[in-house]
């Protein structure tokens, strides 16, 4: 699939303004051609009837094309929640797995099994970043894989038996109108953000795993980027800079897990500074972000109460980037 980046470099100020105006209109038209409603399907907090767990999943839903981002931890959590919410995934053909961890990959096979009868193509194209299928092991040599599997290859094989096709992303790629995957994120600011204790083989040597297959989804709206991460192991700042390398636009909203729940005050301050400079207006942290961490960032930025939420099952961000249902109203 083709992908592109756009940069404007013109010497004459009038030409710059004209070109930027034309591009702005074009970018808006692309985004508005398939505006997405974002619904949280798995995270730590739930209302009556939903299932909360340590995981993440969200649906980017639009008239022309929709994309499922991550699939939760336990095999049936997201299935339970979509049935509870009345969300139909049978028309959704594309799935993004943010990284190999089981709390983001656990529901894929059950969801495919459930919705395939209604649509043979349902949830059949799965995007993963390069390195997703590398085998992880503990220091004791115990294998750890995606979902409930110890073997990454077995997980892949079981998915392919169900008609799932994996596409490995190596660089920023547009997978649906105005939806961009970062692919593996260069670690320029944050080196690694996440748990330790797993290893991968690099040239015959057991090397600490820093989850280079961590990728995020960017939605290029008329206002700027909406960035969604499953865990943000690559670092929020690093990820945001990849999106701004695709198109130099503000990062107006962040959604999902950013693994800041154990972050130091220094890291939170650095993150808040970057987000403020990037133009953040709306924040819906969930999963591993941490409520206290999110509140700290929101306070430093001075975000109004209506612009920060802690995601719950059924939380929604509307196509015009407003929170209409959340755990914190």
Q: Where do the model's predicted regions map?
A:
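N-terminal secretory signal peptides that target proteins for export/translocation
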Residues: 1-15
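Bacterial N-terminal signal peptides
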Residues: 15-29
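Boundary at the C-terminal end of the N-terminal hydrophobic targeting segment
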Residues: 31-33
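Conserved beta-strand hairpin/beta-sheet module of binuclear metal-dependent hydrolase folds
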Residues: 36-85, 210, 214-229
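Pre-active-site segment of Zn-dependent metallo-hydrolases
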Residues: 51, 64-94, 117, 193, ...
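Active-site metal-binding motif and surrounding structural segment of the metallo-beta-lactamase
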Residues: 76-128, 244-253
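Cap/insert and terminal regions of metallo-dependent hydrolase folds
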Residues: 94, 101-107, 125, 207-314
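Active-site-proximal loop/helix segment associated with metal-binding centers of metalloenzymes
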Residues: 148-150, 173-222
């Amino acid at each position: 699939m083709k992908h592109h980046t756009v940069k404007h470099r013109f010497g004459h100020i009038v030409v710059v303004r004209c070109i930027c105006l034309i591009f702005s209109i074009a970018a808006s038209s692309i985004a508005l051609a398939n505006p997405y409603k974002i619904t949280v399907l798995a995270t730590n907090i739930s209302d009556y009837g939903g299932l909360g767990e340590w995981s993440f999943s969200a649906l980017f839903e639009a008239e022309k094309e929709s994309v499922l981002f991550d699939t939760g931890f336990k095999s049936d959590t997201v299935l339970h929640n979509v049935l509870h919410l009345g969300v139909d995934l049978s028309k959704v053909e594309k799935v993004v797995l943010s990284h190999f961890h089981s709390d983001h990959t656990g529901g894929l096979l059950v969801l495919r099994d459930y919705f395939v009868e209604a649509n043979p193509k349902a949830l059949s194209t799965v995007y993963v970043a390069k390195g997703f299928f590398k085998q992880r092991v503990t220091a004791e040599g115990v294998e750890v894989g995606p979902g409930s599997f110890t073997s990454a290859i077995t997980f892949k094989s079981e998915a392919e038996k169900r008609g799932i096709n994996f596409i490995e992303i190596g660089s920023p790629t547009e997978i649906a109108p105005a939806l961009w995957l970062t692919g593996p994120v260069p670690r320029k600011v944050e080196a690694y953000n996440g748990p330790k204790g797993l290893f991968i083989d690099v040239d015959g040597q057991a090397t600490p795993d820093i989850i280079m297959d961590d990728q995020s989804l960017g939605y290029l709206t008329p206002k700027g980027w909406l960035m969604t991460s499953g865990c943000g192991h690559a670092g929020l700042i690093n990820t945001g800079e990849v999106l701004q390398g695709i198109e130099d636009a503000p990062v107006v909203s962040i959604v999902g897990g950013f693994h800041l729940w154990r972050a130091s005050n220094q890291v939170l301050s650095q993150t808040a500074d970057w987000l403020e400079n990037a133009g953040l207006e709306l924040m819906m942290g969930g999963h591993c972000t941490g409520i206290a961490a999110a509140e700290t960032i929101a306070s430093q930025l001075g975000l109004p109460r209506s612009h920060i939420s802690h995601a719950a099952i059924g939380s929604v961000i509307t196509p015009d980037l407003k929170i209409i249902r959340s755990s914190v109203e």
